[in-house]
Amino acid sequence: MKACCSRILCQERIREVRAMTIREEIEQLKKEKNAVILAHYYVRPEVQEIADYVGDSFYLSKVAVGLKEKTIVFCGVSFMGESAKILNPEKTVLMPDMAADCPMAHMASAETIEKIRSEYDDLAVVCYINSTAELKRHSDVCVTSSNAVKIVKALPNKNIFFIPDRNLAHYIAGLVPEKNFIYNEGFCIVHE
């Protein structure tokens, strides 16, 4: 029993030393490359531990704007890295996992936007921040869940096409009944 416990403790210590060495290497690389690490709440705890900033996508986008570092390593889904690049075109934005994606971000298309534009007069296309750069490019305004109601109320347009999240659109429509909402069928598969 004693030998078994010693071996387990030894293995734990080896893992701790490796983790410390990796953290030290990351810190050194951040200095050499003038880089900062942003991590979304959804990433693994060990990634959050080495990050300079941890938060939701809106918080991290705001943080990204004020950074002095030339390289942003964004640990999150692709639309978050795209948003950081849009807000910081002069900086290098790296995504450690290019396969990290949010399916809802792709649940609308430029073609759908143009189709709806052709069917409605006095239309504003309102895009939730959790969407691709392509959707943002075809929209009139981009909002977050915390500012969407205020922005939609302030829009002069009567018709609102909210993309890509139908659930957030329904919520906003309930608070802004004077607008006519056209619903996209996008949704978050995690929250559905």
Whereabouts are the PLM-identified features?
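Active-site loop-to-helix "anion-binding N-cap" substructures in soluble metabolic enzymes
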Residues: 20-192
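Histidine-centered metal-binding segments
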Residues: 4-5, 40
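Short, Lys/Arg-enriched N-terminal segments with co-localized hydrophobic residues
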Residues: 8-19
